[in-house]
């Protein structure tokens, strides 16, 4: 049995005090309930056991041509000039100790499967069990576990 830890959306824009979305409550909730600390424990455990870790985060092109204006979750991103690829906004929070040599997938929708290589990667690595840690249980975490 091959197992993978999937880390979803632990990004600055959602969790860092300087994030434009953080005031909506995710950052405070995660701090209050130790979400980042618990995710870090999982990451350390998987690394210690040489198990697969997959990092998933949002990331839109600089011109937002891959950001759907039909998406109720992200259609406002261009007006706030956030969640662009290769910016501080979508970097993983430093507390988790992200390593670029671990598999990283950029998504443009809530679902980490939508137009990404996630499914193909899981099949390629013969992953039969996943452990998921994310900051939006009702959104991205739910969509990957359904």
Language-model features: locations:
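Active-site acidic carboxylates
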Residues: 1-99
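Generic detector of well-ordered alpha-helical packing
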Residues: 10-13, 107, 139
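Cofactor-binding loop segments of dinucleotide-utilizing enzymes, especially the Rossmann-like FAD-
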Residues: 58, 135-137
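Short secondary-structure boundary/hinge segments and terminal tails
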Residues: 64, 114-115, 140
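Internal catalytic-core helix/loop-beta-alpha segment
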Residues: 85-134
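Short glycine/serine/threonine-rich phosphate/pyrophosphate-binding segments
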Residues: 137-144
């Amino acid at each position: 049995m091959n197992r993978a830890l999937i880390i979803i959306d632990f990004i600055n824009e959602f969790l860092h005090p300087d994030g434009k979305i953080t005031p909506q409550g995710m950052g405070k909730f995660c701090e209050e309930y130790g979400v980042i600390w618990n995710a870090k424990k999982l990451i350390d455990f998987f690394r210690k056991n040489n198990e697969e870790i997959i990092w998933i985060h949002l990331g839109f092109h600089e011109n937002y041509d891959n950001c759907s204006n039909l998406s109720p979750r992200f259609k406002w991103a261009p007006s706030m000039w956030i969640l662009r690829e290769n910016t501080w906004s979508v970097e993983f929070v430093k507390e988790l100790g992200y390593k670029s040599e671990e598999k990283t997938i950029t998504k443009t929708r809530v679902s980490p499967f939508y137009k990404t290589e996630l499914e193909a990667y899981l099949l390629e690595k013969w992953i039969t069990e996943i452990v998921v840690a994310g900051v939006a249980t009702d959104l991205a975490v739910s969509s990957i576990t359904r």
